[in-house]
Each structure stands twice: as structure tokens, then as C-alpha cells.
């Protein structure tokens, strides 16, 4: 079964995960609950697997609205302990979860982000069209991600500046992403 996403407000998280999710799991006699966002229900005996991409909110709690930060920091350690298994996207995040939440490393699987098979190399003429559109035909480095200070874009710009200073190159830097908590 697939459940519709819960509301994205911390006051509603509790109701969703402690009432709605357990009721749906019971109704459908589910054997496992997979949460791709890391949230779990503390109110069900059904086995659960959480995907915790990172726990950056532990290190930078001010990057989130106050209620969200409090909810995450209070509950994610509990979710990590409750989960039958955890998945995360890097060895760094795994180590962070192990150290911060005192979870055994054997409980955590590192599963790297995948790429849909629809994404494949472009034909040469299409590559040239893209270059002409975005960089007047120049080669480029591409950053795709949330535009947020925790994504370290300042160092990306410094690194690109260093590259340009050390190489006689017409390479451009393209930055693509959604402004999130922009300051």
C-alpha cells in the first residue's frame, strides 16, 4: 500500500504517524512500513525501515523552523532506535547516525542515490544546443541542489574561482536549484 504524504507541519506529524499510519498498517495487515523520509510510528508493532538521508538538523538546528527542529531532534533518535533497519545515502551519514544516536552500524545500510534509466547521455547536437542556450557554447560545471547555506555553495564558488585562476579556460559554472530558507 502507499499512503498519501502526511501534512508538512510538526503539529500534524504526531497525529499522522501515531494514529493514521498505524491504523492503515493494521487495516491492510502490513508486514513492513518503509519510510523514505525517516519518520516512523512509535505506536505500531509492524516492522519499520527508515531512510535517513542525513541528520544535518542535529548540527544546524537553526536551519529549520523552530517547531520542526524540535520535533526532529526529539523524535529522530527514537525513530533510529525503533527501526528494524535504517538506510542512508553515505558512509558519512551512517557514521553520524551511529555516533549521534548510538545505533549499531550493522543496523544501517548505505544505499547511494540512484539515477532513473530515463537519464542517459545526450546526442552531440543536443549537447551543443544546451551549451549554446546556457553558456554561449562554453563547457561548464553543473551544480544541482537546494540553494541553502548548508550546501556549501560559498566554497563551490571559491573552488571555481581557484580553478579559473589556475587554468586558462572558458569553462562556466551553472548553479541550478530551489531557494530553500534563503538568507
Q: Model regions: which residues?
A:
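Carbohydrate transferase catalytic cores enriched for Leloir-type hexosyltransferases
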Residues: 1-183
Amino acid at each position: 500500500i502507499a499512503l498519501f504524504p502526511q501534512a508538512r507541519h510538526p503539529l500534524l506529524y504526531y497525529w499522522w504517524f501515531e494514529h493514521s499510519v498505524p491504523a492503515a498498517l493494521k487495516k491492510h495487515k502490513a508486514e513492513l512500513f518503509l519510510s523514505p523520509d525517516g519518520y516512523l510510528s512509535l505506536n505500531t508493532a509492524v516492522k519499520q525501515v527508515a531512510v535517513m538521508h542525513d541528520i544535518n538538523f542535529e548540527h544546524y538546528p537553526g536551519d529549520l523552523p523552530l517547531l520542526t527542529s524540535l520535533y526532529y531532534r526529539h523524535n529522530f533518535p527514537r525513530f533510529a532506535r525503533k527501526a528494524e533497519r535504517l538506510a542512508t545515502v553515505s558512509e558519512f551519514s551512517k557514521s553520524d547516525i551511529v555516533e549521534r544516536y548510538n545505533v549499531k552500524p550493522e543496523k544501517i545500510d548505505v544505499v547511494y542515490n540512484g539515477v532513473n534509466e530515463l537519464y542517459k547521455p545526450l546526442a552531440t547536437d543536443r549537447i551543443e544546443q544546451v551549451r549554446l542556450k546556457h553558456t554561449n557554447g562554453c563547457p561548464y560545471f553543473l551544480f544541482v541542489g537546494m540553494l541553502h547555506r548548508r550546501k556549501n555553495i560559498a566554497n563551490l564558488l571559491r573552488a571555481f574561482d581557484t580553478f579559473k585562476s589556475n587554468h586558462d579556460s572558458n569553462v562556466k559554472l551553472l548553479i541550478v536549484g530551489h531557494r530553500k530558507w534563503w538568507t
